[in-house]
Amino acid sequence: MAASVQPACLDLHFSGKHPPLLKHNAIIVRCVSSPNVIPEADSISGPPDIINTNRDQRKVVRIAWEKLVRWSRSLRAKAKTDVLERTRKVVVLGGGSFGTAMAAHVARRKEGLEVNMLVRDSFVCQSINENHHNCKYFPEHKLPENVIATTDAKAALLDADYCLHAVPVQFSSSFLEGIADYVDPGLPFISLSKGLELNTLRMMSQIIPIALKNPRQPFVALSGPSFALELMNNLPTAMVVASKDKKLANAVQQLLASSYLRINTSSDVTGVEIAGALKNVLAIAAGIVDGMNLGNNSMAALVSQGCSEIRWLATKMGAKPTTITGLSGTGDIMLTCFVNLSRNRTVGVRLGSGETLDDILTSMNQVAEGVATAGAVIALAQKYNVKLPVLTAVAKIIDNELTPTKAVLELMNLPQIEEV
């Protein structure tokens, strides 16, 4: 029997607390650590091929990173700031959580920028103006002093350079019709609302011009993985603005982008909007799976299937497949399906736990857009001749035509298919 081979002691010295492991020919050698000896990199001995390879890899990584940093600095140096400089007033329609977070963000972009929030609740209005807090949604967060609230639509919209629309989709038509007389026909609308109008299947890009009776009203959709609370806390966030007007998309990018908020641009308005709407329905499905304690395997399978369904429908509607895999698609889906801050996911969890939809909605102080949007899914599936089993199951559960348990059984018994 051959004698066992013991690795020779290598006199390697490193200054760190935990000396690294060198792996060579399946023998792992722990190097000796000495606090008194800090060698030069070139003095490290060992198998030449491994050391040279590691040095080459480190060099490649270092060069790649340095190139990236130089490229980034170069673009930042050339970035235009004229949009922010000439913007004097921004109006935010709606005093909910996301409208408040975006109002605070825009106000922090420039001192002296007037940010007007049009709110319905006079108590919230007073709280913002006197105490600089939205007492209903962010009572512990102080708003910038250049955020001003009002219940007067005419005053809020007067001389505004940009309008951020944060009214829930199902109430947007009636709300906009009520303020249409005060809206400048050239005022760009940046929609923060995600969903489909239940009776008409319209997206916000269709609702706004129809309600305002102006087919040329400038429009931008803002979407992506973004919780209002994290935006309020200045945590790193990335979103996308979509508009058929590239110049307008670039202008809104300049207006909103900051050191903690990245803004990409897109021309695919349909893709950004439909992904943002349907991900809310999928989040309800994900919540149901969690509420029923069906495990991680089923969660992954369901969300994967739901992503495919969103892609199938979106592309039939004219969206680009790449949009669905971007921030407004996959990014937003991941956030809303897997994180408990999601209102739509919370609705699903409670449905899966056995609560009734009426009890759930009565106890909530914010709108879960996916509940109403789910009702539009079946009509869209029929209109575009697309099978959407997961999203349709959610609509049936919400309409009380299917129990979560029965829905799971039906979905698991669907025909075995080839993945596409």
Swiss-Prot record:
Disruption phenotype: No visible phenotype under normal growth conditions, but leaves have decreased levels of hexadecatrienoic fatty acid (16:3) and increased levels of oleic acid (18:1). Its EC number is 1.1.1.8. Changing residue 194 to A: Loss of activity. Required to supply glycerol-3-phosphate in the chloroplast for the synthesis of glycerolipids. Required for activation of systemic acquired resistance (SAR). Provision of glycerol-3-phosphate may be involved in generating lipid signals necessary for mediating defense responses and SAR. InterPro entries: 6-PGluconate_DH-like_C_sf, 6PGD_dom2, G3P_DH_NAD-dep, G3P_DH_NAD-dep_C, G3P_DH_NAD-dep_N, NAD(P)-bd_dom_sf. Transmembrane segments: none annotated. NAD(+) binds at residues 94-99, 171, 194, 228, 343, 369. GO terms for cellular component: chloroplast envelope. The keyword Lipid biosynthesis applies. HAMAP family: NAD_Glyc3P_dehydrog. This is Glycerol-3-phosphate dehydrogenase [NAD(+)] 2, chloroplastic. Belongs to the NAD-dependent glycerol-3-phosphate dehydrogenase family.
